[in-house]
Amino acid sequence: MSQSEAMTQVESSKPYTIFTLSQKALIVTIISFAATLSGFASNIYFPALPQIADDLSVSTSLINLTVTCYLIFQGLSPTLWGSLSDTKGRRITYICTLVVFLGACIGLAETRNYAQLLVLRCVQSTGSASTIALGAGVLGDITTREERAGYMGIFQGGLLMPVAIGPVIGGVLSDKMGWRSVFWFLTIYGGACVLVIVLVLPETLRSMVGNGAEEPKRYAMSPLALYQRKKHFRQDTNPSAEGEKPAPKRTDFLGPAKILFHWNTFCAIFYVAVHYAAWQMVLTAVSVLVKQKYHTSEIQVGLIFLANGAGSIIGTVLVGRFLDYDYRRILRKYGGDEQRMPIEKARLRTVWLWSALECVSVLIFGWTVDQGVHISVPIICFFVLGWAAISLQSVISTYLVDIHHTQSASATASLNLVRCLLGAGGTAVVGPLINSIHVGWTFTLLTGIMLVLGGLALVQIMFGDAWRQRREHNSPSEMEGQRNV
């Protein structure tokens, strides 16, 4: 046996991660808690918009511009933080982003004019939006392909909780204590999140700690990790484990852009981003449409959003479990050889189902609201839309982390960039579209666009494996990282 073969055999016997199931559960809970900040900061704000416009003496259109700007920075900021976390560590990046978020929330609670509101909402988005990409990076560090989708489903379900309850909390706070209380709530919530991360979350970046057995730099140590290391880690490690840790990488702020324009990811990202934009356009239009057609109150509008949130949470948990089951089933057909198994077949073959459900729910929602059909029908469509849309997002997110395992945060940031920019554009035009061609035809147009661009998914499934193998052949370090997943 050659020396290289012996080293490979030794490395293959090492666990991918030393974190136990209970420790993984704790880590996933923490990153899901952090990811809710982005959703809360976005959704809790909507019920307060009319009150803010009156208090600052500006038009509703100008207040709506703060929503568009928030989405733009929500797409841009993870490209910075994601690249940093892939090289400097997850913990320090989490702490930096949340400090920015807390400062913005305090400033927003004390803002006195529209200019301050607009600028600070952009800063707030810069701090909160990256928690999703960072969470995906942590999941890539501690999970294997066979279990990743299940954990991704739990993570996605946690971060979608604010979609369901954010508008309700925002409506109650702004109604009882004024719109500034919304930002004080976010300050307290964000402060609790920072405290948990500082005290508990361990560093997971594999280029720093390998499978978790290596001691990170002092600034990356958490008190809990230090205690666990003294109690458990030393007995599980030995000098030969050094080979497990990947070589450190330089920070590449263009990393997300490079991932975006890889042929083996561009089609998947653009495909799911269009579906995300359609989803956001429906979410943006719902409150105005149901008030006009069904004469609902603000509280009733907030309760309608619960249907979408419930569908999203249920969908992401179930699709994660299904993806793990399906992956293991297909892997058995290839004799357990992950290098021969086409990951596109294992991950993407259900996208047609979720896309079809989203298209049907958008179409029926549009026409039932347009014709004033009983409100229960659009509410059911709203539930199905949340289920289908987030299931599709979870499928693509898991796939991207699988094929860009060594740059998982950057890969998620590239997805976030495209879908947030398209979402910002969509939310800006949905109102004028409805005014121009009416509700039913607006959502018919959205459905048609999603159907036409379904060809991108077909291209990804047909050619993705060949493109990925070509990229790995041209980048030996990336290929080695994938082998170690």
Where does each model-flagged region fall?
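Glycine-rich segments within core transmembrane alpha-helices of 12-TM secondary carriers
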Residues: 147-177, 181-193, 308-316, 416-426
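Cytoplasmic helix-loop-helix junction between adjacent transmembrane helices
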Residues: 120-160
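C-terminal transmembrane bundle
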Residues: 39, 68-71, 109, 125, ...
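Central mid-sequence intracellular linker of multi-pass
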Residues: 15-22, 148-150, 175-263, 317, ...
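Helix-breaking motifs and short loop linkers at transmembrane-helix boundaries and internal kinks
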Residues: 41, 56-57, 88-89, 110-116, ...
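Short hydrophobic/alpha-helical segments at membrane-entry points of transmembrane helices
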Residues: 113-121, 133, 183, 268, ...
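Cytosolic juxtamembrane N-terminal segment immediately preceding the first transmembrane helix
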Residues: 1-41, 50, 54
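Conserved MFS/SLC helix-loop-helix module at the cytosolic interface between two early adjacent transmembrane helices
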Residues: 76-115
